[in-house]
Swiss-Prot record:
It comes from Gallus gallus (Chicken). Belongs to the TFP11/STIP family. Involved in pre-mRNA splicing, specifically in spliceosome disassembly during late-stage splicing events. Transmembrane segments: none annotated. Signal peptide: none annotated. InterPro entries: G_patch_dom, GCFC_dom, STIP/TFIP11_N, TFP11, TFP11/STIP/Ntr1. This is Tuftelin-interacting protein 11. Keywords: mRNA processing, mRNA splicing, Nucleus, Spliceosome. Residues 41-60, 99-112 have a biased composition (Basic and acidic residues). GO terms for cellular component: catalytic step 2 spliceosome; chromosome, telomeric region; extracellular matrix; nuclear speck; nucleolus; spliceosomal complex; U2-type post-mRNA release spliceosomal complex. It is found in: Nucleus.
């Protein structure tokens, strides 16, 4: 190694100066324990760099005071040709501009060769210089042995040619070793990774990055021996970098609008300056400091060419150019977005334009059709418009031009065209003679003119529904005229007329007809009715209105009952006409009111009739008994049983006892007993009180037979009476068993029906069920509500349901009540 690698010389003065940079020799011998360490001699300590040294051509020895051995062979080190100082300086300058080159990138012919052993090297150094022995033949001794390792691996599942591990994730080839090129430390010659390492672990080694960073920093603190100037380094910014910077920094350099007209006083300089916007401050020149320039030190070099104003202006131009590029990029992006938005707007406007053109075309066609109708509506037209043709035109408008027809004012159009034709169509119409006249044409116009939206919301505004207005202004006057001339007792024609139109006319018009026209006529006729003189029964002209009016007829029932009660004051049960008059009202009146009417007006008359009945076994007159029994279906079973217990059975048992006390014929008594029992229905006989009376008669007969001991007894009388008693008791038992079986079957069917219905029963359904069980009419009142709740009629009582509670209408307020109390009040 030449001394020029350890010491440098000044090109100008020729003074030797020690170069402190790290050389290749230092790196190669970093970890060499036998490296020569220069010991400073006394002369070097005294004179320093001016001490005399051996010739540069002489090679320093590795021993302390060992002299040079000239008998040893000469060893040459491939270190290249020595260049002059100027060439070294130029090379170093050029090297500083270039990036450090890795060891792998240097061609093999330029790499320093290994140092050969011999010469002045010690024996301990020869092994280090020569390198280590190759490991290629390591483990070759196993080829001459039994191969126990390979067999053990195969027993544990190892497959030759595959990696170790459960999933064969191990490496197949053994780890390769790479021999270092020189004597330097680890990493001194670049990366030492093998091709196998790069293949198995392709991650970039952090040591390589650290080496590159070290080389870069090392080149920065090296001192230029000639003091030459380094080449200036320029940093360039591309347009893409400026665009990216502009996208990150969204703050524009231009001032905001509210700050563009702000007056600013600048007092940072020697003089006061006034600016009228913040943007002017950003464009002002930098003012040099007033302080005197600092004196240059010994080591500092004066600037030969320094122009701060020019540098500032250049920097300002650069900044302005950058801002212009950023603003241009933003403007370009804005324009591109604007193009996209305008494209979408054009498409949208094109769709709107086509839609508007279609709408204009459709409106033009609709206008032509309307004008054609107006032309044909003129009196002088040869081909006048008919109602059927007008309906076809409206059907065309509804089918082909539905949107235009829906948006148009159908009320005005119908008033102008349809109403005159409809008046002409019904001008000769008599509703009572031809009740179905015009139903088909009106049903067709209902589908054309009725406003479905108002219908779904329950609206009744005549100004917005053409069909309702048509029926009210054109159809309703004919109905008013005919009802004014109508006689309530001739109800058939009027009922048929309303039945034909009930599904066509609006609900509120039907309510108006029934409440304002029909009901007053019926009420007046009921007031004039006299059941004693009128030959036509009242139910014949009241009951036909029940399907249409239902609960509306409730106010008529009370005066009818009063008139019937007055007519029954002088009635005798022998007159069967009373039953014919009252029987149709049984299902119309509520069960409670009907029972009260019967108990007050009929039952006393029947009791008087039974009191007049004479029971004579030898000559029996049954007319009075038949008159009473004939009312069995009209009065309740309990009322009839009460009459029999009070007015019939005491006399009947008394006659039986008298007959048994006079040596009777038991055969005749048996026939007499069975004959009277056959006069009663099964429902009456099943009553416990009636059973007790007939059983009492059997007991009297048995006692009479048993008490005749020693006297004359009719042969077989005792057996006959016993057989009769047994037979009657068995019939009673069978009847009771049959009743129990029927009740069980009804309960089973009811349970099956309730199980089949998966819909849970609410409180309204419970009330409906109870009403059906007690034969009480339960129905909603049409068009009547209280605080948004639907009103119902439960018999004669008006109720409403709110959160599972029944409220009954009182005199002034609504009173909550229980379900059982409600049923009792309805009865």
């Amino acid at each position: 190694m030449s001394m020029s690698h350890l010491y440098g010389t000044d090109g100008e003065d020729g003074v030797e100066m020690e170069n402190f940079e790290v050389s290749d020799w230092d790196l190669q011998n970093e970890f060499n324990p036998h490296r020569h360490r220069h010991r400073q001699t006394k002369e070097e300590a005294t004179y320093g760099v001016w001490a005399e040294r051996d010739s540069d051509e002489e090679r320093p020895s590795f021993g302390g005071k060992r002299s040079r051995d000239y008998s040893a062979p000469v060893n040459f080190i491939s270190a290249g040709l020595k260049k002059s100082a100027a060439e070294d300086v130029s090379d170093e300058d050029s090297d500083e501009d270039e990036k450090p080159v890795k060891q792998e990138e240097i061609p093999k012919e330029f790499v320093p060769k290994k140092l050969k052993t011999g010469g002045n090297f010690k024996p301990s150094q020869k092994g280090f210089v020569g390198g280590t022995k190759s490991f290629m033949d390591f483990g070759s001794w196993e080829r001459h042995t039994k191969g126990i390792g390979q067999k053990l691996l195969q027993k544990m599942g190892y497959v030759p040619g595959r990696g170790l591990g459960k999933n064969a994730q191990g490496i197949i080839n053994p780890i390769e070793a790479k021999q270092r090129k020189g004597k330097g430390a680890v990493g001194a010659y670049g990366s030492e990774r093998t091709s196998q390492s790069l293949q198995d672990f392709p991650v970039v080694d952090s040591e390589e990055e650290a080496e590159e960073e070290f080389q870069k920093e090392l080149s920065q603190w090296r001192k230029d021996p000639n003091g030459g100037k380094k080449k200036p380094k320029y940093s360039y910014k591309t347009v893409e970098e400026l665009k990216a910077k502009g996208r990150i920094n969204k703050q524009l350099s231009t001032p905001q609008k509210e700050l563009s007209q702000v007056k600013v006083i600048d007092m940072t300089g020697r003089e006061q300056k006034v600016y009228y916007s913040y943007s002017q401050i950003s464009h002002k020149h930098n003012i040099p400091d007033d302080n005197p320039q600092q004196l240059l030190g010994k080591d500092s070099k004066p600037q030969g060419f320094a122009l701060p104003e020019l540098e500032h202006n250049l920097q300002l131009l650069i900044d302005i150019t950058e801002q212009e590029i950023i603003q241009s990029d933003r403007q370009l992006q804005y324009e591109r977005d604007m193009v996209v938005n305008l494209t979408h707007e054009i498409q949208k406007m094109s769709e709107i334009l086509s839609h508007e053109e279609t709408a204009i075309s459709n409106l033009s066609k609709v206008l032509d059709m309307v004008e054609e109708c107006e032309r044909r509506m003129q009196p002088s037209c040869e081909n006048p418009l008919t109602l059927d043709e007008c309906a076809k035109i409206f059907e065309t408008l509804q089918d082909k031009y539905y949107e235009e027809y829906r948006m148009s004012d159908r009320v005005d159009l119908a008033v102008a065209i349809v109403y005159p034709l409809m008046k002409d169509y019904f001008k000769n119409w008599d509703p009572l003679k031809d009740c179905t006249y015009g139903t088909e044409i009106i049903a067709k116009w209902k589908s054309l003119l009725e406003n479905d939206q108002l219908l779904s919301h329950g609206g009744q505004d005549l100004s917005t529904d053409a069909f309702h207005r048509l029926m009210w202004e054109i159809w309703m006057p004919y109905v008013r005229n005919i009802v004014a001339q109508w006689q309530p007792r001739n109800c058939g024609s009027m009922v048929d007329f309303l039945d034909s139109w009930v599904h066509i006319i609006p609900v509120w018009i039907l309510d108006n007809i029934l409440d304002q026209l029909i009901f007053p006529k019926l009420q007046k006729e009921v007031e004039n009715w006299n059941p004693l003189t009128d030959t036509v029964p009242i139910h014949s002209w009241i009951h036909p209105w029940l399907p249409l009016m239902q609960a509306r007829l409730e106010p008529l029932y009370s005066p009818i009952r009063n008139k019937l009660a007055n007519a029954l004051q002088k009635w005798h049960p022998s007159d069967s006409s009373a039953k014919l008059i009252l029987q149709p009202w049984k299902d119309v009146f509520t069960p409670g009111s009907w029972e009260a009417f019967m108990v007050k007006n009929i039952v006393p008359k029947l009791g008087m009739c039974l009191n007049e009945l004479i029971i004579n076994p030898h000559q029996q007159h049954m007319d009075a008994f038949y008159w009473v029994i004939d009312w069995e279906g009209m009065i309740s079973v309990s009322s009839l049983v009460g009459l029999l217990e009070k007015h019939f059975f005491p006399k009947w048992l008394q006659v039986l006892c008298s007959w048994l006390s006079n040596s009777p014929n038991y055969e005749e008594i048996t026939k007499w007993y069975l004959g009277w029992k056959s006069m009663f229905s099964d429902q009456v006989l099943a009553h416990p009180s009636i059973k007790d009376k007939f059983n009492e008669a059997l007991d009297i007969m048995n006692r009479a037979v048993s008490s005749s001991v020693g006297g004359y007894m009719q042969p077989g009388a005792r057996e006959n009476i016993a057989y009769l008693t047994h037979t009657e008791r068995r019939k009673d038992f069978q009847y009771e068993a049959m009743q129990e079986r029927r009740e069980a079957e009804n309960m089973a069917q009811r349970g099956i029906g309730m199980a089949a219905s998966s819909v849970p029963m609410n409180f309204k359904d419970l009330i409906q069920t109870k009403a059906e069980e007690h034969n009480i009419v339960f129905m909603p009142v049409i068009g009547k509500r209280h605080e948004g709740k639907q009103l119902y009629t439960f018999g004669r009582i008006v109720i409403y349901i709110d959160r599972g509670v029944v409220f009954v209408q009182g005199e002034k307020t609504w009173v909550p009540t229980s379900l059982q109390s409600l049923i009792d009040m309805a009865k």
